[in-house]
Swiss-Prot record:
Species the sequence originates in: Clostridium botulinum (strain 657 / Type Ba4)
EC number: 6.3.2.4
Chain positions recorded as Mg(2+) 2 binding sites: 260, 262
Positions that bind Mg(2+) 1: 248, 260
Catalytic activity: 2 D-alanine + ATP = D-alanyl-D-alanine + ADP + phosphate + H(+)
Pathway annotation from the record: Cell wall biogenesis; peptidoglycan biosynthesis
Protein name, per record: D-alanine--D-alanine ligase
């Protein structure tokens, strides 16, 4: 099969995407497929560069990759691709929309408000949410332009920074607890990872630098494990996920809260999904093969 590995793109996560793409290519080649590296530098590249491939493996992150646009183009061209469809991708990229659906479905998530300008900042509403808060681009990833703000004095500056990366900014209560991630493959949860950043939170450096954080497979207490698994599965169903996603949570006093869903989890050597799969004996090459297989089974 001729597999095009699509990477690069136009988002702030371009370098992360290129790293993911290189790793994916290295291991897909072990499966004896014909691999075509496809580096996207501008939106128009997609239509031209995917000609002649049988399957698109998406190693893109962020805008024009994770937000449903590339998925829609590939679907229009009748080219099968990895991961979730356009609707789920678009919703999960929009943190505000994701949290609205989670709240409607009675799935725990931290309180938040969104603003689209400095003038929109409602300090009373933020006080009700409770400090400290995370201020971040509504549709950003990899914790780019994400700041932990401890009081009202830092809000304006943090919002201004986030607005450089997105037209909407989320201000979300900081739920202090243990951060965990649940990797879902074809609707089943792989082993849970605990994320223990060496910085105050799991920022860009902690995510991608060697030694930036400790990410370890953990065995949760039985009752908590059941709650986490039920919540991850509820997210999968409510947001109509397909093939694979990563559900990030915080556990506070034995109660899990969903932070966000990642529909195209990173595939670098430091990435969480391969670590979780490896804990049940699924090698990186086998994981990629499963993603291709399950993606081809989805009716688009």
């Amino acid at each position: 099969m001729k597999i095009g590995v699509i990477m690069g793109g136009i988002s702030t996560e371009r370098e992360v995407s290129l790293n993911s793409g290189r790793e994916v290519i290295k291991y897909l080649e072990l499966l004896e497929h014909e691999i075509i590296p496809i580096i996207i530098d501008k939106k128009e590249d997609v239509v031209e560069k995917v000609k002649g491939i049988d399957f698109a493996f998406l190693a893109l992150h962020g805008e024009f990759g994770e937000d449903g646009t590339v998925q829609s183009v590939l679907q229009t061209l009748d080219i099968p691709y990895s991961g979730c469809g356009p609707l789920t991708s678009a919703i999960c990229m929009d943190k505000d929309m994701t949290k609205k659906i989670l709240k409607y479905a009675n799935i725990n998530t931290a309180d938040w408000v969104n603003v689209s300008s400095v003038e929109d900042i409602d300090y009373e509403a933020i006080e009700k949410i409770g400090y400290p808060v995370f201020v971040k681009p509504n549709s950003g990833g990899s914790s780019v332009a994400t700041n932990l703000v401890k009081d009202g004095d830092g809000i304006k500056e943090a919002v201004e920074l986030a607005l450089k990366y997105d037209k909407e900014v989320m201000i979300e209560n900081y739920t202090k607890g243990e951060e965990i991630t649940c990797c879902m493959l074809n609707g089943k949860m792989l082993p849970v990872l605990a994320i223990r950043p060496h910085a105050e939170f799991f920022d860009y450096t902690a995510k991608y630098a060697d030694g930036g954080s400790d990410e370890v497979v953990i065995e949760l207490e039985e009752n908590l494990h059941k709650k986490v698994e039920e919540m991850a599965l509820a997210c999968w169903k409510e947001l109509k996920c397909e093939v694979y996603v990563r559900v990030d949570m915080i556990v506070k006093a034995g109660v899990p809260y969903v932070l966000e869903l990642n529909t195209l989890p990173g595939m670098t050597k430091n990435s969480l999904f391969p670590k979780s799969a490896n804990a049940v004996g699924i090698s990186f090459a086998e994981l990629l093969n499963s993603i291709v297989k399950y993606s081809l089974e989805v009716e688009r």
